[in-house]
Amino acid sequence: MDSDEGYNYEFDDEEECSEDSGADEHEDDLELGEVELVEAGLSGSERAGICGEGGGSALGPGPGGEEEEDYRYEVLTAEQILQHMVECIREVNEVIQNPATITRILLSHFNWDKEKLMERYFDGNLEKLFSECHVINPSKKSRTRQMNTRSSAQDMPCQICYLNYPNSYFTGLECGHKFCMQCWSEYLTTKIIEEGMGQTISCPAHGCDILVDDNTVMRLITDSKVKLKYQHLITNSFVECNRLLKWCPAPDCHHVVKVQYPDAKPVRCKCGRQFCFNCGENWHDPVKCKWLKKWIKKCDDDSETSNWIAANTKECPKCHVTIEKDGGCNHMVCRNQNCKAEFCWVCLGPWEPHGSAWYNCNRYNEDDAKAARDAQERSRAALQRYLFYCNRYMNHMQSLRFEHKLYAQVKQKMEEMQQHNMSWIEVQFLKKAVDVLCQCRSTLMYTYVFAFYLKKNNQSIIFENNQADLENATEVLSGYLERDISQDSLQDIKQKVQDKYRYCESRRRVLLLHVHEGYEKDLWEYIED
């Protein structure tokens, strides 16, 4: 291995990767570049072009949108993340004095916990440590250099492709296994691009578990896209292992948000994506991360399909095939060719004792029949309840997508108004109204998740009243904004829009404050699903 003392990565000017270390004691000494203030309570990213992008440190809003507390964070670029990573490696190397790429592998093995690495490093068993980390102790004499005794002009076969090349065309790791550079390049490219491996790429020799160091990878790969992918992969664990760092969940965004303490608070990336730092989902006030996670799982898995089957079908009492009733008669005949059982849909008993009771079962009140019917009714009620909340959740989600498209329409309306002797400041009420509308849609969407898991009590009734009031006002505001605004109706509609979005803001604040008050005073009781 040709080990360089430096740890240099050159990032593509047009693309970035990201990574960050633990709670870095010396992070204040790093030049993190300029940061911007971000209002974390604003709505989604689609307003680019009307609203500016966010980034840098932020003031976190209170539950109603007001800035009740500081929740500061930084949005870090690839270079800034790499600075943190290199600084962490440098701090460790000041003590253990190994090549930087070896130290990076050691830190990765210990999930970037410097204290754990130091403790193991000085416990007196270095050979065991390096063996566990799958690297050769750099203090040992290199077997690779001992083997380089052939003349560079003498050809030798590669043990992968079996083609002959000069000795100078071969390279390897400290384990002593050498292969031609072409095979190395193709091997590394396959591992990085197709298998998504970065920090755990081992020597291609059969049975050898020695890891490929970063300098070797960067030296043997010539494709800049593969290098960039590798940079993303090796730094990923750096972010994932640090509770103060979180990747932006937006597709193709490689920024990282760094906070001073982890919490379920809204943060906004420079790309415009606002998300919950705790769970990484879109900001979901007023529902807590725990319940949102359960809701998403419930929506994604087949549990509701099972509920529908339980509510609308029954099993044949003989062969247990699932049967759906498609007529009014209770006389059921199993269509399974190997069964053909005849039974009563109501009590699931054999049909023969029923005589002429084609539409009514006189054994309806028997314990077994009652238990089966009660179970079916419970399943049906659970399904109907789920569909009630799910439909409203999805409706607001769909409306929110439509509302985001309003930004483009509003921008056009604002430009038209300015051409009719209105100033820029006079038309800003439209943008503000769409901002409020999107905030209300998002809040309403997540109130239905909150309500789904909420047990009924006096406080839940107040919550539902607040929810209904906000929902009605939001629909009225949406209707105002979708109207065609003529010059004659401008002043009238302007007053209505301003009054309504201010009312929506107020009602949204009341709803959120009530929910958060319930959290603080432990007023809410939940249905465990």
Curated annotation (Swiss-Prot):
Residues bound to Zn(2+) 6: C344, C347, H354, C361
Protein name: E3 ubiquitin-protein ligase arih1
Start and end residues, zinc fingers (IBR-type): 228-289
Subunit description: Interacts (via the first RING-type zinc finger) with ube2l3. Associates with cullin-RING ubiquitin ligase (CRL) complexes containing neddylated cullin.
E.C. no: 2.3.2.31
Region (TRIAD supradomain): 154-365
Compartments where located: Cytoplasm; Nucleus
Zn finger spans (RING-type): 158-208, 316-347
Superkingdom, natural source: Eukaryota
Gene3D superfamilies: 1.20.120.1750, Zinc/RING finger domain, C3HC4 (zinc finger)
Activity regulation info: Autoinhibited by the ariadne domain, which masks the second RING-type zinc finger that contains the active site and inhibits the E3 activity. Inhibition is relieved upon binding to neddylated cullin-RING ubiquitin ligase complexes, which activate the E3 ligase activity of ARIH1.
Organismal lineage: Eukaryota, Metazoa, Chordata, Craniata, Vertebrata
First-listed, main subcellular location of the protein, grouped into a coarse class: cytoplasm
PANTHER family cross-referenced by the UniProt entry: RBR FAMILY RING FINGER AND IBR DOMAIN-CONTAINING
SMART domains: IBR (SM00647)
Catalytic activity: [E2 ubiquitin-conjugating enzyme]-S-ubiquitinyl-L-cysteine + [acceptor protein]-L-lysine = [E2 ubiquitin-conjugating enzyme]-L-cysteine + [acceptor protein]-N(6)-ubiquitinyl-L-lysine
Positions of Zn(2+) 3 binding: C248, C253, C269, C271
Summary of the function given for this chain in its UniProt record: E3 ubiquitin-protein ligase, which catalyzes ubiquitination of target proteins together with ubiquitin-conjugating enzyme E2 ube2l3. Acts as an atypical E3 ubiquitin-protein ligase by working together with cullin-RING ubiquitin ligase (CRL) complexes and initiating ubiquitination of CRL substrates: associates with CRL complexes and specifically mediates addition of the first ubiquitin on CRLs targets. The initial ubiquitin is then elongated. E3 ubiquitin-protein ligase activity is activated upon binding to neddylated cullin-RING ubiquitin ligase complexes.
Binding site for Zn(2+) 2: C175, H177, C203, C208
UniProt xrefs under Pfam families: Ariadne, IBR, IBR_1, UBA_ARI1, zf-C3HC4
Gene: arih1
Ranges where the record places region UBA-like: 77-125
Positions contributing to Zn(2+) 5 binding: C316, C319, C334, C339
Listed Gly residues bias regions: 51-64
Pathway(s) annotated for this protein in UniProt: Protein modification; protein ubiquitination
Residue sites binding Zn(2+) 1 per the record: C158, C161, C180, C183
Ariadne domain as annotated region, ranges: 380-529
